[in-house]
UniProtKB/Swiss-Prot annotation:
InterPro entries hit by this protein: AlgH-like (IPR003774)
Gene Ontology CC terms: cytosol
Entry-linked HAMAP family: UPF0301
Entry superkingdom: Bacteria
Family per similarity comment: Belongs to the UPF0301 (AlgH) family.
Pfam families: DUF179 (PF02622)
The protein's name in its UniProt record: UPF0301 protein PSPTO_5037
Length: 190
């Protein structure tokens, strides 16, 4: 018997199906940072909060006023796990104290210096900043996929960096030729 390797979803988008009722993930687009036999980690990239980079900087370095442009940089709700921890997706090329290069020419930075560099004008111009992440135990995401909770879409940096947050979910679905408004909210298996 031939052993089949599991199919992992690292570096793909997860599109929440319309029947997703979990408020943490309903109508979300999630970038999968890691997916292996031990579980998965992703960042929801289409849920901006009312919190801005200026608000975060006020907490991190209150002695310095945040530049006005920081009031325009939204902080996204990246998921329900460790909602006080920050993550920044940005194009590869700049390295910070805690930066991991990911496939497709993007990086994930988790140290405060990336936020300071963005605020001070020498950080990555293209970025998605989140607080929190989505986490799945071993086999959990695979089970959700089998239950038709998610669609997958290949990663596209334009969706991440060039499309407004509120349009990212539909943009990813369009890459698949799908209009989410036309999909039933009832889950099922054929």
């Amino acid at each position: 018997m031939k052993k089949v390797s599991p199919s992992y979803l690292k570096h793909q988008f997860l599109i929440a199906m319309p029947h997703m009722h979990d408020e943490n993930f309903a109508q979300t687009l999630t970038y999968v940072v890691e997916h292996n036999a031990n579980g998965a980690m992703g960042l929801v990239i289409n849920r901006p909060q009312s919190l801005t980079l200026a608000d975060v900087l006020e907490q991190l370095r209150p002695e310095l006023p945040a530049p006005k442009r920081c009031q325009e940089i939204a902080i996204h709700a990246g998921g329900p796990v460790q909602t006080d921890r920050g993550f920044v997706l940005h194009p590869s090329g700049q390295t910070f104290q805690a930066t991991v290069d990911l496939p497709g020419g993007i990086s994930l930075s988790t140290s405060q210096d990336v936020l300071f560099s963005i605020a001070d004008g020498y950080g990555p111009d293209q970025n998605v900043i989140t607080l929190g992440y989505a986490g799945w135990d071993a086999g959990q995401l695979d089970a959700e996929m089998a239950d038709n909770a998610w669609l997958t879409c290949s990663f596209d940096p334009a969706i991440l960096f060039d499309v407004d947050s509120d349009q990212r979910l539909d943009a990813a679905a369009r890459r698949l030729g799908i209009n989410l408004a036309l999909i039933s909210t009832q889950a099922g298996h054929a």
